[in-house]
A protein has these predicted regions:
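Glycine-rich, Lys/Arg-enriched anion-binding loops that position phosphate/diphosphate groups
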Residues: 139-203
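Short, positively charged and aromatic/hydrophobic N-terminal segments
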Residues: 3-9
Length: 203
Protein backbone atom coordinates (compact mmCIF):
# COMPACT_ATOMS: atom_id res chain seq x y z
CA UNK A 1 0.00 0.00 0.00
CA UNK A 2 1.40 3.41 -0.92
CA UNK A 3 2.17 5.86 1.87
CA UNK A 4 -0.74 8.20 1.02
CA UNK A 5 -3.23 5.32 1.15
CA UNK A 6 -1.70 4.11 4.39
CA UNK A 7 -2.17 7.58 5.85
CA UNK A 8 -5.81 7.66 4.76
CA UNK A 9 -6.55 4.34 6.46
CA UNK A 10 -4.61 4.91 9.66
CA UNK A 11 -7.65 4.39 11.90
CA UNK A 12 -9.29 1.68 9.81
CA UNK A 13 -6.78 -1.11 10.38
CA UNK A 14 -6.38 -1.52 6.61
CA UNK A 15 -2.65 -2.22 6.63
CA UNK A 16 -0.65 -4.03 3.99
CA UNK A 17 2.50 -2.11 4.87
CA UNK A 18 6.02 -3.49 4.76
CA UNK A 19 7.49 -5.40 7.67
CA UNK A 20 9.49 -3.52 10.27
CA UNK A 21 12.76 -5.04 9.05
CA UNK A 22 12.01 -3.87 5.51
CA UNK A 23 11.27 -0.36 6.76
CA UNK A 24 14.50 -0.27 8.78
CA UNK A 25 16.66 -1.23 5.80
CA UNK A 26 14.94 0.61 2.94
CA UNK A 27 16.45 4.03 3.67
CA UNK A 28 19.24 5.83 5.48
CA UNK A 29 16.98 8.75 6.36
CA UNK A 30 15.45 9.65 9.70
CA UNK A 31 13.33 6.80 11.07
CA UNK A 32 10.12 8.17 12.55
CA UNK A 33 8.53 6.03 15.25
CA UNK A 34 5.10 6.98 16.61
CA UNK A 35 3.51 6.04 19.93
CA UNK A 36 0.73 7.67 21.94
CA UNK A 37 1.29 10.75 24.07
CA UNK A 38 0.39 11.12 27.74
CA UNK A 39 1.15 8.44 30.33
CA UNK A 40 3.48 5.77 28.96
CA UNK A 41 4.12 2.17 29.99
CA UNK A 42 6.65 -0.58 29.33
CA UNK A 43 4.70 -1.65 26.23
CA UNK A 44 5.20 1.48 24.11
CA UNK A 45 8.65 2.17 25.59
CA UNK A 46 9.81 -1.36 24.81
CA UNK A 47 8.56 -1.08 21.22
CA UNK A 48 10.92 1.82 20.61
CA UNK A 49 13.78 0.18 22.54
CA UNK A 50 13.54 -3.05 20.52
CA UNK A 51 13.60 -1.22 17.20
CA UNK A 52 16.62 0.82 18.27
CA UNK A 53 18.29 -2.43 19.35
CA UNK A 54 17.60 -4.00 15.95
CA UNK A 55 19.05 -0.96 14.16
CA UNK A 56 22.29 -1.47 16.08
CA UNK A 57 22.28 -5.20 15.35
CA UNK A 58 21.91 -4.50 11.64
CA UNK A 59 24.72 -1.96 11.75
CA UNK A 60 22.41 0.88 10.72
CA UNK A 61 23.11 4.37 12.03
CA UNK A 62 19.74 5.90 11.18
CA UNK A 63 18.62 8.78 13.35
CA UNK A 64 15.44 7.97 15.26
CA UNK A 65 12.72 10.55 15.79
CA UNK A 66 9.99 9.70 18.29
CA UNK A 67 6.52 11.10 17.64
CA UNK A 68 4.14 10.99 20.60
CA UNK A 69 0.59 11.84 19.62
CA UNK A 70 -2.95 10.56 19.13
CA UNK A 71 -3.67 12.88 16.22
CA UNK A 72 -4.15 10.83 13.01
CA UNK A 73 -2.54 13.49 10.84
CA UNK A 74 0.51 13.62 13.09
CA UNK A 75 0.75 9.83 13.32
CA UNK A 76 0.58 9.58 9.54
CA UNK A 77 3.99 11.24 9.31
CA UNK A 78 5.62 8.21 10.97
CA UNK A 79 7.26 5.20 9.36
CA UNK A 80 6.05 2.83 12.10
CA UNK A 81 3.06 3.45 14.40
CA UNK A 82 2.83 1.43 17.62
CA UNK A 83 0.34 1.15 20.51
CA UNK A 84 -1.94 3.79 18.97
CA UNK A 85 -3.91 4.47 15.80
CA UNK A 86 -5.80 1.19 15.53
CA UNK A 87 -3.37 -0.40 13.09
CA UNK A 88 -1.02 -3.34 12.76
CA UNK A 89 0.99 -2.68 15.92
CA UNK A 90 -1.86 -1.50 18.14
CA UNK A 91 -3.74 -3.79 20.52
CA UNK A 92 -6.61 -1.60 21.71
CA UNK A 93 -9.44 -3.42 19.98
CA UNK A 94 -12.07 -5.99 20.87
CA UNK A 95 -10.50 -8.59 18.57
CA UNK A 96 -7.01 -8.37 20.07
CA UNK A 97 -5.55 -11.91 19.82
CA UNK A 98 -4.79 -14.10 22.81
CA UNK A 99 -1.73 -16.36 22.78
CA UNK A 100 -1.85 -20.06 23.61
CA UNK A 101 -0.64 -19.33 27.15
CA UNK A 102 -3.65 -17.07 27.75
CA UNK A 103 -1.73 -13.79 27.54
CA UNK A 104 -3.30 -11.11 25.37
CA UNK A 105 -1.05 -9.53 22.77
CA UNK A 106 0.21 -5.99 23.25
CA UNK A 107 2.18 -3.75 20.92
CA UNK A 108 5.61 -4.97 22.07
CA UNK A 109 4.69 -8.58 21.25
CA UNK A 110 3.47 -7.63 17.80
CA UNK A 111 6.70 -5.72 17.13
CA UNK A 112 8.95 -8.47 18.52
CA UNK A 113 7.23 -11.08 16.36
CA UNK A 114 8.56 -9.24 13.30
CA UNK A 115 12.05 -8.61 14.66
CA UNK A 116 12.95 -12.00 16.13
CA UNK A 117 12.18 -15.65 15.46
CA UNK A 118 12.53 -19.22 16.65
CA UNK A 119 13.83 -20.07 20.11
CA UNK A 120 15.07 -16.52 20.59
CA UNK A 121 11.59 -15.09 20.13
CA UNK A 122 10.00 -17.74 22.35
CA UNK A 123 12.42 -16.98 25.17
CA UNK A 124 11.91 -13.23 24.81
CA UNK A 125 8.18 -13.84 25.26
CA UNK A 126 8.78 -16.13 28.24
CA UNK A 127 11.32 -13.94 30.01
CA UNK A 128 10.12 -10.40 29.30
CA UNK A 129 7.42 -9.73 26.74
CA UNK A 130 4.51 -11.79 28.04
CA UNK A 131 4.57 -10.25 31.49
CA UNK A 132 4.73 -6.76 29.96
CA UNK A 133 1.83 -7.66 27.69
CA UNK A 134 -0.15 -9.15 30.56
CA UNK A 135 0.41 -6.08 32.73
CA UNK A 136 -0.56 -3.72 29.92
CA UNK A 137 -3.76 -5.68 29.29
CA UNK A 138 -4.73 -5.89 32.97
CA UNK A 139 -3.58 -9.48 33.46
CA UNK A 140 -1.17 -10.42 36.23
CA UNK A 141 2.26 -12.03 36.05
CA UNK A 142 5.40 -11.66 38.17
CA UNK A 143 8.91 -11.69 36.69
CA UNK A 144 11.40 -9.40 34.96
CA UNK A 145 8.78 -7.99 32.59
CA UNK A 146 6.52 -7.08 35.50
CA UNK A 147 9.42 -5.34 37.22
CA UNK A 148 10.25 -3.50 34.01
CA UNK A 149 6.62 -2.41 33.76
CA UNK A 150 6.82 -0.97 37.29
CA UNK A 151 10.19 0.71 36.77
CA UNK A 152 9.12 2.45 33.58
CA UNK A 153 6.00 3.87 35.21
CA UNK A 154 8.33 5.81 37.53
CA UNK A 155 9.56 7.90 34.59
CA UNK A 156 6.13 9.49 34.01
CA UNK A 157 5.84 13.07 35.22
CA UNK A 158 4.40 13.59 38.70
CA UNK A 159 1.64 16.05 39.57
CA UNK A 160 4.26 18.58 40.68
CA UNK A 161 6.17 18.38 37.37
CA UNK A 162 5.36 20.06 34.09
CA UNK A 163 3.73 17.78 31.52
CA UNK A 164 6.13 19.35 29.02
CA UNK A 165 8.78 17.06 30.50
CA UNK A 166 6.88 13.96 29.35
CA UNK A 167 8.78 13.51 26.07
CA UNK A 168 12.11 13.89 27.87
CA UNK A 169 11.06 11.33 30.48
CA UNK A 170 9.91 8.96 27.73
CA UNK A 171 13.34 9.16 26.10
CA UNK A 172 14.97 8.38 29.45
CA UNK A 173 12.68 5.38 29.91
CA UNK A 174 13.59 4.12 26.42
CA UNK A 175 17.28 4.40 27.27
CA UNK A 176 16.80 2.30 30.40
CA UNK A 177 14.66 -0.25 28.56
CA UNK A 178 17.32 -0.52 25.85
CA UNK A 179 19.95 -1.40 28.44
CA UNK A 180 17.75 -4.04 30.11
CA UNK A 181 16.56 -5.50 26.81
CA UNK A 182 20.06 -5.62 25.30
CA UNK A 183 21.33 -7.54 28.32
CA UNK A 184 18.36 -9.91 28.38
CA UNK A 185 18.78 -10.65 24.68
CA UNK A 186 22.50 -11.30 25.20
CA UNK A 187 21.75 -13.75 28.04
CA UNK A 188 19.12 -15.52 25.93
CA UNK A 189 21.60 -15.98 23.11
CA UNK A 190 24.19 -17.27 25.57
CA UNK A 191 21.67 -19.78 26.91
CA UNK A 192 20.81 -20.97 23.41
CA UNK A 193 24.50 -21.33 22.55
CA UNK A 194 25.14 -23.29 25.77
CA UNK A 195 22.33 -25.68 24.96
CA UNK A 196 23.80 -26.32 21.52
CA UNK A 197 27.25 -26.96 22.98
CA UNK A 198 25.81 -29.43 25.51
CA UNK A 199 23.81 -31.17 22.78
CA UNK A 200 26.92 -31.58 20.63
CA UNK A 201 28.89 -33.03 23.58
CA UNK A 202 26.10 -35.49 24.39
CA UNK A 203 25.99 -36.68 20.81
Amino acid sequence: MERENYNDSINKGEFTMKTIKEILTESNGVLKLAVHNGVFHADDVLCVAMIKNKLKELGLSREVEIIRSRNPETLAQADIIMDVGGGKYDHHSSDNPMQENGVLMAACGKVADELYEGEELKMLHDYVLDSVQASDNGQKRSDLGENLFSWIRLFNTSLSESSKLSDERFAQAVEMAETVFDRQLFMIREEIADRKRIFIKVR
